[in-house]
């Protein structure tokens, strides 16, 4: 599923034209050795293809054998490696908690809920943009990189949030949007007026002469949100590049002054105490200097569609990697000069695997991002995926990730439908079990711990997402990102406990009286309590340091195993089908074992501490189980 394309119920998604091309990343066919996570696990990755009569069953086995350094954890290790096994919780500030009754979430609201993260077990939060903005794209159009959007509060409110978070042991990550600013930023106004020093802060071009003294765009480049990526500016009498909305002009990073200005922005927020940054839309930062037309993709006949072209001149140019490496050095230097935890950088971009891996490091080992986001659970897998598909995409990332780096697993975000809406309401617990028991880093979008669902019936009058508004009354529902951005459902009180106001910036989902945090905290079994149990389990040595094996047991069920010498083995088994399945895990676990259930889902017929027979593990539709193995 490509940026600009929306999820549709019942549709089977394929990779976009960019990622459908066969590459040497398509299927690993030879053993590969890797380091995984901060524990220096080393292992060999294997795959085997089993062909049966009338059915091709892919059994992909990924086995990481333990080889760890012998040392005791200490504060230095914690400061260096704190992020490698972290669960980062994404907060969409506008929707998280409103403190003043205006219907819009804010910084004081987030601060008031920091204890919630302590209670849940979350120790790192990532804030979507909070900078000053005209809110054309709800904060991803920044008019001042050093100030707070007034609706969200003040710089003093931000300082108070950081102070309280530090007191509670919570690290704060900021969204950083470098590709473009708002057209209301002083830089753009000065550039449009050709003020000295700012003439080339943005990408300006004359265009091509058209009929009747008109000017046509310089080339065929298409915006992510459809239509030309070039916008005519009457005052300057030139086109400016805008790969997103017309209110988001692309900055010109071939101008050293722009790089320096953004370096200073990063240092400004580092000095305020943030633990790092999520770099937005990193793949778009540079474009072809020659402005060459991009070739047709053959995916669609619509010239306004983002899928109309192969984006070889506007995405993932080599200079993108160089800039990320430059910012990594800036962060490393800041960490070296300022005691405390490593300041980290995670990058966001939907791209082919071979291109994403370059954001970790280049072929010479020069370090880039601490990790580029892995969107496979969003773009490659869906409710119709079979068990071997899950194992394959998990294995693929681990196989081609450079040695010494950490994997990550993004389950949802503000641009895509929620887990419960993509995979089905009954899958929420199983998907959280999967994310929490895989090696590396987990990314949780707010409300996913509760199983919140998209509000697909938001009316045209209540729609605020700009691309949806541009799509018009007949098409807005297929484009809108509003359904996954509705207010956090804290309780069954007015506005789900999000706000005391008479209205909220987006409607609260009508199911809030049944689906909310307070109800789930008080229930014997709930999605929240499953999530809480998984967070606690992640602190176990076997999940932090253990080896990893994955296998499709049949077309509908797969299992992952985590092992560490001297520790009980953990087994996660997931049924991705809508039918009850019974599987034999005896061969997968090798030795006779006692199986004891540690975590079960809300609707499971099993109960925690129940004993299972390896040859008769029964799973309800879409059920996941986390099992502890002890040798007899």
UniProtKB/Swiss-Prot annotation:
Residues 1-29 have a biased composition (Basic and acidic residues). Gene3D superfamilies: Glycosidases (3.20.20.80), Golgi alpha-mannosidase II (2.60.40.1180), Oligo-1,6-glucosidase, Domain 2 (3.90.400.10). One of its GO terms (biological process) is carbohydrate metabolic process. The record marks 415 as: Transition state stabilizer. Glycans are attached at residues 179, 212, 333, 461, 575, 578. Keywords: Glycoprotein, Glycosidase, Hydrolase, Signal. This is Maltase 1. It comes from Drosophila virilis (Fruit fly).
